[in-house]
Amino acid sequence: MSPNSSKTRTDQISSMPGINEATKVESKNVVKDAVPIKSEVETNGTSIVREKQDPSYVGWKQVGGWEEKDELTSEDLLVDVNKDTFLGNLLPDKFYGDWYHEVAILIIAGLCSFVLGYFKFSLASVLIVMLTTGMLYRTSSKKYRESLRDLAQKEQTVEKITSDYESVEWLNTFLDKYWPIIEPSVSQQIVDGTNTALSENVAIPKFIKAIWLDQFTLGVKPPRIDAIKTFQNTKSDVVVMDVCLSFTPHDMSDLDAKQCRNYVNSNVVLKAKIFGMDIPVSVADIFFQVFVRFRFQLMTTLPLVETINIQLLEVPEVDFISRLLGNSVFNWEILAIPGLMRLIQKMAFKYLSPVLLPPFSLQLNIPQLLSKTGLPIGVLEIKVKNAHGLRKLVGMIKKTVDPYLTFELSGKIVGKTKVFKNSANPVWNESIYILLQSFTDPLTIAVYDKRETLSDKKMGTVIFNLNKLHANHYHKNEKVHFLRNSKPVGELTFDLRFFPTIEPKKLLNGDEEPLPDMNTGITKITIRELKGLDELSDKKFVFAELYVNAELVMTTKKEKRTAHLKWNSDYYSVVTDRRKTICRFVLKDQSGKVISSSVQPLNHLIDRTEVNKEWIPLRNGKGELKVTTYWRPVDIDLGLKSVGYTTPIGMLRVFINKAENLRNPDSLGKISPYAKVSVNGVARGRTNERIETLNPIWNQSIYVSVTSPLQKVSIDCFGIDTNGDDHNLGSLNIQTQNIYHKDNDDKYTIFIDNAPRTGNLIGKKGVKGTVTYYLSFYPVVPVLSLEEAKEVDEINEKKDKLEKQKSTLDDKNISKEEKERIKKEEFRLTEKYDMYSYKMKLDLDELLQYNAGVLGVTVLGGELPQPGLYVQTFFDSCGYAAITSAKNAIRTIKTGWSGDFMIKELEWSVTTFRVTKTKDANKAENFICEVNIPTIELVRNCYYKPSVLNLIGKKSAKLLVQVSWFPVTATELPQSDLITNSGDLKITAKSAENLIGVNKNGYSDPYVEFFLNEKSTSPFFKTAVQKKTLNPTWNESKTIEVSNRVNDYLTINVKDYESTNSNRSIGKAVVPLSTIDPESDTTFNIPLVGPKGEDGGVLHLEFEFEPRYTTNVVKREAGLGNFATKGLGTGIKAGSTVFALGTNVVSTGLGTIDKVKAGVFGGKKSTTTGDKKSEEKQ
C-alpha cells in the first residue's frame, strides 16, 4: 500500500518487538474534502489570505502504509534477511561477496556486450548476458551487505583501545523500544506547529497561496548517541561533556514487503500552491552526524542548571535525498546540481562559525527560558572613565579630535557616550547601561571621531570577552588598548559590572518565591494589536509610536488600515526609576497625522498584564490598543536613587473574617492557619495564627496600599504543621472592579461594603476551603511628596529658562536641529508637569493636621552588629512586621528598601525598628536590638531630611531613615482599627441580687467565673465563695489584656459551691466587650439566665478600660508547631446574636440589656467557637 493510496488509515497497534500490543498510536485520517483554515497575513501593508492545509500522512504508520495485517509475527521476525540465492548455492565463496567482485562483474558484462555487438549477435544474446550478470551481481551484493553487518556486530563487541568515549547503549535501547510509540505524536506536533507558522509567515512571497507539510515522518529508527565523554578536571559546579549524535536511515534493501511496512525511513513532503497547482518537494533518507560539546553551569536552587553552552566541534555531516515534484515520474533530484552540496557545506560553515563553532558557543539561560518572558539575563553597567593617547587618522582634514565611544553586541550598537570636544585624552566618567542576552557574545567598543558634515570616522576598536563576568560580576579599572591595523592607538580605562535579572525561585515544596518589589529592572513592552478603528480615511496605512519619558524609542511597521491590526513589536529597556517612567502610545496614519494616543505609567502597564487587562482604550474612544508588558527586577546599584517609594492612590482595607473547611496537610494533627494579603504577588500583611483548627476565625483587618486600580490583590492561606513548617493551603483573587470610583473632579471616593464576600481557595490540589472577608477603600489625599515638590520646582525653573532662551533666538537664524531640540524639551517638560498637576503642595504642618494617613518608610543605609540579619518595622499593635528587609549579607546596609503602613491615629501611633536573626520573627520573639519611637515624632524628624536612628539591645545598630506622610480621606474609621480596640480591661464583680437558691435551706454558696471567648476550659478570673446567700457582695477585681475589644466577648458563669459534689451552675450571661465604653467606667446590671431558662437574678459588674497597643502574638516554641499559649483568639463579631440556652446577653447598645430565648449553651454546650457564625463589628 503506497503513501499515495486513497485508502483510509486507521489507528493500529505497533508491530515492533517488545512493544505492548495494548498500546495504540493515533493515526490521522486522510481528509480530502476538508475546508482549509484561512490565515490572514500582512505583508508590507497588504493583506494575504493564506490557506492552512491539513497534512495527508503523518507518522511512520501512515507514510509506510501499515495495516493490521502487516503486524509481524514471530515467524516473520525469524525470516533471515540474507535469503539463499541460486548462484550462492553453486559458486564457492571466494568468487563473490567483495567489492572487487562487483567491479569485475560490471567489467565482464560490459566486455561481453561489446563482443556480442561487435560480431553482430542479436539483442537476445545481450539480454542473456544481462540476466546472468544481474543474478551474479545480486548474489555478490547480498553477500557483501552480510559481511558489513557482521563487521558492525564485531565492532560493537570488541573492546575499544581508548576509553575516553563511553557508549550509552541503555539509552539507545530505550529509544529503540519506545520511539515507534512516540514518533507519530512527535511528528504530529511538528506538523501542526510548522503548518501554523508557514501560514502566518510574512516572508513567504505573495504568489504562494498556501504552503504546508503534506507528509511527515522521522521513521522508526530513532536518533542515536554514538559516544559520550565527560571531562574530569572541571570546577565542582561545572559539567562539560562531548556527545556524538547521529541519525541514520534504516537499510531496507534485504527486507520483504511486509517487513518494509514495519521499518519506515524518514520522509518529508512539502507542498506549495502556486498559480493553482500543488507543487511537492520531498526530502527522504535524512542522515546527519554531529559532535557537540555541552557545558552545564550548575546552581544550588531549582532548576539546578543555570546555563547550558552548546558548541559544535565541527560542521555537521548532513546528507539527504531531495526531489522536486516529489516521487512522480517527472521528479528531479535537487542535489544532482554540480557543486550544490559543497556550496551548502561552505555556507553552513560561514554562518555557523561565528555562532556555534569553536571558540563560539550558544548559551541558554535556563531560568530565563522557564520564565517564558524572553527577557535578557541581566544589565551590564559600563562606567567609562577616560582614554588617553588617542591617535587620529593620518590625512584627516580635521586637525582636532572629538571622540566618542560606541558599544556593540551581536553586530548592533547598544550604547553611546557623549562627544568629548577637542581632546585626545577625553575624560567621560559616564555610565552606560545595556541589556545582556548571554556572556558568550563579546563586547565591541569602538572610538569614533565626530565630524559635522562628513560621516564619523572610526579610530580604533576593542573586543572584550564578557565570559569573565560570569564568575566575577565586577571588574574595576580595566585597561585595554584600542587597535587599528593591529597596532595600539590609545588606551581606555573603564569599569564593568553585571547585575543579573532576578527570576522567581522555585522552592523545594514546589511554591515560587515572590519577586522583590524593586524600583530598577528590565521591561519588555510589546505592542500587539489594535481594534475598533472604524474611522474612515483615505490614508490606507497605520503605525504606532512608543515614547518613554517623552523620548521616541520604537516605531511599528505600517499596516493596512482595517478594523483589526496586528504588530507584535517588542521594545526592551533598562529601567532605572520605574515609578517615574511614563509611556505614551501614539497612533498615526501614513502622512504622520495623529489619530489617537494614550499615556500610561509603566506601573499601570505592568499591572494590566498582571490582571490580564491588556487592552488600553485610546483617547476620544478611537479604538483599543493591546499592550503586553513584562517586568523583572534587577538590583542595579544607583545609590539612593535605586530606593524609591511609589505614592499610593489609596488604602484597601481587607477585613478577613474567617475560613472554613481548610485542607489539612499535617498527618500528625491539625494545622495552625493564618492568612496573608498580597498585592501583585508581594505579601503586604498577615493575620495571626489560630491554633489547630480547620475553621479559623480571625476578625482582623489588613490595610494594603494600591498604586493603581489595576493591581492584583489576593488572599493566601497558609498553615503551620506540628513540625513548624509552612504549607500553602490555597489562594483567591479579590475582585476589585467595583471598588475604585471617581467623582466629578476625577478624585477617588471612599468605598465601604458592609456585605460579606466569600471566595474559594484554589491550591495545587484543587479547590478546598472558603474565606469570608469584607472590603473598604480609603483614597489618599492627592498631595505632592517632598521629592515630587522639588521636581515640580525644577520643571518650573527649566520652563522659565526655556522661555527666556526662545525669546532671545531669532526664528530666521535658528537651525532646524535647534528648533527640534526646543520642541522636544517643551514636550518633555509638559508631560512631566501633567503628572503632578492634580496634586496639592502642602508643608509638614499642614500634613500633620490629618490624623490618619499612609506612612512611607525608606531605609537608605545603616550599620548592623553582624552580617546575616534582618531589619523589621512594626507599627502599633501589629504582631508581625509590616516591612521586612532582605537578608543583609554584610554589616553595612548599601542597598536600601521602602514600605508603607496605614496609620489610623497619628497621635497614638508607635513605630518600632528591630534587628533580628529570623525573617518571620513576630513581636514576641527574641531580637538583637530595637528602638520604639512615636510615629508623629518620626515624621517630624525624618520628613525633610534623613535622620539616624540608634537601635539598642544586646548589641547596637544604626539606621538612616526618611519618611513621607500622605493623608487619607477618612472621616471615620472602624472601631476595631483604633487604639480603643486593645488595652487593659479591669473587671470588678460587685454584687448580685435574687440568685437561684439550690441548697436545702433555700440559699446558695455563689461565686462567679469569667471566660474570654470560651477559648479555655479554666476561667481567667474566679471570685471568692459567699456562703448561704442569694444577694452576695464580692467587690473583687481582675485586670486582663484585651487585643480585640470590638470582637471579643466575656462568658460569665455563676455557680453554687458544693464541698462534696460538683459545683452547679445557677446563672449564665454573655457580655460583648464592644458594649464597654473605652473612655469611661461602665457599670452593667446583667440579667442571668438559670439552668432551665428561668430568671436567674441580676449580676452587678463594673468595667474600666485603659486603651493601649498590646502585643497580640505569642512566642513560638522551638521545635514545635504549637504555641505556648492557646488563650489568644477572637470570637464572634460584635453586633451578631449570641445564642445561649438560659443565658442573657448584653446587646450592642451601650447600657442596654436583652434576653434571648434559646441557644446552644445547655448541657450540650460546645467549648469552642469555631463553628459560630462570625461577623464584623464596625
Swiss-Prot record:
Gene Ontology CC, one term: plasma membrane
Positions of the SMP-LTD domain: 164-367
TM regions (residue ranges): 99-119, 121-141
Record-level GO BP terms: endoplasmic reticulum membrane organization; endoplasmic reticulum-plasma membrane tethering; ER to Golgi ceramide transport; phospholipid homeostasis; regulation of phosphatidylinositol dephosphorylation
Biased composition range(s): Polar residues: 1-17
Cytoplasmic side: 1-98, 142-1178
Quaternary data: Interacts with TCB1 and TCB3 via its C-terminal domain.
Listed name of the protein: Tricalbin-2
UniProt source species: Saccharomyces cerevisiae (strain ATCC 204508 / S288c)
